[in-house]
Amino acid sequence: MPLPIWLIPVALKGAAIAAGAAGAGAAVRGAKKMKDADDTMKAAKSRHERNMAKFKKENETTTKDMDKLGKLELEILHSFSEFSDVFEQIKNRPTFETYSKNGVSLPQYDGEKIKEVSVGAGVLLGGLGGAGLGVAGGFAAAGATTAAVMALGTASTGTAIASLSGAAATNATLAFLGGGALGGLAAGGAAGGGMAAGAAALGAATLGVGLLVGGIIFSVTGGKLSDKADEAWAQMAKAERKINTICNYLVDLRSTSNKYYETLFKVNGIYKRHLNGLKSIVTMLGHTDWNTFTPEEKTLTENTVLLVGLLYNMCKVELVLKSKNENDINTINKVAVETSISNANAVLADKF
């Protein structure tokens, strides 16, 4: 039945109130949805920034420790020229036999090879001053001995690397080693320093776009906010899983690097004392004929040669093995590192 005319204004008013209430409710729900989306977006951005700060800290710390190891290896190899200069003055010296004991084998002394690696290491050391953070660590990742030998190779331009100076020689060597554990390192060193060792140790692809959540999505506002908030959170969570995997890897690499550094530092300390003793015999005392050496002097000389071989082998170890799949993290060469440490300790226990 139609409403009486006098009731129509009241009915219209009631309908308006009801509609207004419904609209207000929808507005409240819409506002809450927007606030929730905004909160989600802010939380995702904040958490991602914390994750990236964690990654940068781990990467920088590991890079510095790898640099420390790489620099020590190059310094050791470069010091072989000093040994060679003194040792070559000794006349009538015998051919020292290859050390083979307790499962440990060391190479027979090769004067030419020692000189070559020493010169190459000197070339690389000369370029470290102008190189970015992570370059020396990249050499440790690939094996400093290999890098030093490559430093005497030929650059892609046809120029002998050893004829280049400073960072140019270092970069040419990095490029020469590009197919190995150092893939992407030269570009990384030029672009951002600390990322260089990460690219060498992790694989360049690992440090690519998948690690980062684009800043654009975090800046979305207005009507698209609610649609993008969940997407931003999902991207952050995906990046977080990858960052955590990388950070765990960096911690493991740092631990392996530091352990190797300790053993290398210990062996080098013994080598330096023996080298100083040999210099004293040959240079200060003027003993340059093996036939006039005392038994103690002969033992010291033989042990110094042995230490050169041990250090040469230790500096050959690649700390990182390049992954066959560029999207995978590289492998820490723990077996080779542990074997090298064990061999060094066995030789020290046997001879020193």
Indicate where each model-derived feature is located:
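Glycine-centered secondary-structure boundary/capping sites
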Residues: 85-92, 178, 336, 340
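Amphipathic, membrane-inserting segments
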Residues: 46-98, 198-199, 204-330
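Extended, low-complexity, charged alpha-helical tracts
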Residues: 29, 36, 40-43, 47-54, ...
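N-terminal amphipathic alpha-helical segments
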Residues: 16-45, 222-235, 239
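Small-residue-rich hydrophobic membrane-insertion segments
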Residues: 1-29, 123-222
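Membrane-inserting hydrophobic helices used for pore formation or membrane fusion
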Residues: 326-352
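Proline-rich intrinsically disordered, low-complexity coils
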Residues: 2-4, 9, 94, 107, ...
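Glycine-rich, hydrophobic membrane-spanning regions of integral membrane proteins that mediate transport
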Residues: 101-122, 134, 138
